[in-house]
UniProtKB/Swiss-Prot annotation:
PANTHER family to which the protein is assigned, alphabetical: CYTOCHROME C OXIDASE ASSEMBLY FACTOR 7
Name of the featured protein: Putative beta-lactamase HcpD
Catalytic activity: a beta-lactam + H2O = a substituted beta-amino acid
Organism: Helicobacter pylori (strain ATCC 700392 / 26695)
Enzyme Commission number(s) from the entry: 3.5.2.6
UniProt GO BP: response to antibiotic
A GO-annotated cellular component: extracellular region
Lineage: Bacteria, Pseudomonadati, Campylobacterota, Epsilonproteobacteria, Campylobacterales
TPR repeat feature ranges: 28-61, 96-133, 168-205, 240-277
Compartments where found: Secreted
Segment forming the signal sequence: 1-25
Domain of life: Bacteria
Recorded family membership: Belongs to the hcp beta-lactamase family.
InterPro entries: HcpB-like, Sel1-like, TPR-like_helical_dom_sf
Cystine pairs: C55-C63, C91-C99, C127-C135, C163-C171, C199-C207, C235-C243, C271-C279
C-alpha cells in the first residue's frame, strides 16, 4: 500500500509515461509497416519518409532499414555517412541487425575506415541483444585471431550460441570444428547434428558439408542418392561447391548414372557462383572461358531441386 501522496503521485506519473511510450511505439510501428509496404511497391520516397518517422519514434528496425537503404543505395543515393548514422541509432535502440551491420562495416572497411576494435564492440552489442549474425561474426574473429587473441574455446562457444539463434552459417562452422578437431576433440556425431541444423536453416555450405558425410559414409551409412540431393540443395542455396559436387557425380557416374549434359550444366552454375574448380573443368572439357559462361548459366532453367 502506498503510504504517502508523494509516492502515489510518482506512480501515477510512471503509469502515464508508460502509456505514452506504448502509444508512441504503436504509432512508430505503424509507420514502419507503411514504410515497408511503400518499399515493396517501389515507392522509395514514401518509404524513406515513413522509415524516418518510425526511427524518430524510437523504432529501432525503422532506423536499421533506413541505414540499409543508404548503405546499398537501394532506392536512394548511396550515402555511407547517413547509413552509419541510422545504424548507430538502430543499435542504440537495441536492434541487433543494426549493430551487426556496423560491426561488418568496421571489420571489412566497407565505406568506412577499417577499425577492428569498433567491429568487436558492435558485434558484442549485437550478440548481447541475441543477434546470431553478431555472435557468429565475433566467433569467427576469435577463431582467426582477428583483432583479438586467438581463442578456439570462445570461438566455439559463440558459434554454438549463434547456431542456437538460427544463424545457419555458424552451425556449419561448429560442425567444421567438430569434424576437423579444430580446438575441440573430434566428434563426428556433433558435426553431423550441426550440419543438419545448418542445412535445415537454409545455409548452403551446411548442406554441402552434410552431403559429403553421406557421400563418403562419415559416421553415417554411405548414401550416394542422399549426398546428391544435399549437394543439389546446396547449389540451389547459391553454394558453388554444391553445384560442383553435383557435376562431379554426374560426370564420373559416382552414385548416379553418368550424364554429361547435366554435369556441364552444374559446372556452369558452380563457375557462375565463383567456384574456381568448376571454371577450370569447363575450360578443359568444353574450352570455354569462365567469362563466357555467365549467359549460359543464367539461361539454364533446370531446377536444382529436381
Amino acid at each position: 500500500m502506498i503510504k504517502s501522496w508523494t509516492k502515489k503521485w510518482f506512480l501515477i506519473l510512471f503509469l502515464m509515461a508508460s502509456c505514452s511510450s506504448y502509444l508512441v511505439a504503436t504509432t512508430g510501428e505503424k509507420y514502419f509497416k507503411m514504410a515497408t509496404q511503400a518499399f515493396k511497391r517501389g515507392d522509395y520516397h514514401k518509404a524513406v519518409a515513413f522509415y524516418k518517422r518510425s526511427c524518430n519514434l524510437r523504432v529501432g528496425v525503422g532506423c536499421t532499414s533506413l541505414g540499409s537503404m543508404y548503405e546499398d543505395g537501394d532506392g536512394v543515393d548511396q550515402n555511407i555517412t547517413k547509413a552509419v548514422f541510422y545504424y548507430r541509432r538502430g543499435c542504440n535502440l537495441r536492434n541487433h541487425l543494426a549493430c551487426a551491420s556496423l560491426g561488418s562495416m568496421y571489420e571489412d572497411g566497407d565505406g568506412v575506415q577499417k577499425n577492428l576494435p569498433k567491429a568487436i564492440y558492435y558485434y558484442r552489442r549485437g550478440c548481447h541483444l541475441k543477434g546470431g549474425v553478431s555472435c557468429g561474426s565475433l566467433g569467427f574473429m576469435y577463431f582467426n585471431g582477428t583483432g583479438v587473441k586467438q581463442n578456439y574455446a570462445k570461438a566455439l562457444f559463440l558459434s554454438k550460441y549463434a547456431c542456437s539463434l538460427n544463424y545457419g552459417i555458424s552451425c556449419n562452422f561448429v560442425g567444421y570444428m567438430y569434424r576437423n578437431a579444430k580446438g575441440v576433440q573430434k566428434d563426428l556425431k556433433k558435426a553431423l547434428a550441426n550440419f543438419k541444423r545448418g542445412c535445415h536453416l537454409k545455409d548452403g555450405a551446411s548442406c554441402v558439408s552434410l552431403g559429403y558425410m553421406y557421400e563418403v559414409g562419415m559416421d553415417v551409412k554411405q548414401n550416394g542418392e542422399q549426398a546428391l540431393n544435399l549437394y543439389k540443395k546446396g547449389c540451389y542455396l547459391k553454394r558453388g561447391s554444391g553445384c560442383h559436387n553435383v557435376a562431379v557425380m554426374y560426370y564420373t557416374g559416382k552414385g548416379v548414372p553418368k550424364d554429361l549434359d547435366k554435369a556441364i550444366s552444374y559446372y556452369k552454375k558452380g563457375c557462375t557462383l565463383g567456384f574456381s574448380g568448376s571454371c577450370k573443368v569447363l575450360e578443359e572439357v568444353i574450352g570455354k572461358k569462365s567469362d563466357d559462361l555467365q549467359d549460359d548459366a543464367q539461361n539454364d532453367t533446370q531446377d536444382d531441386m529436381q
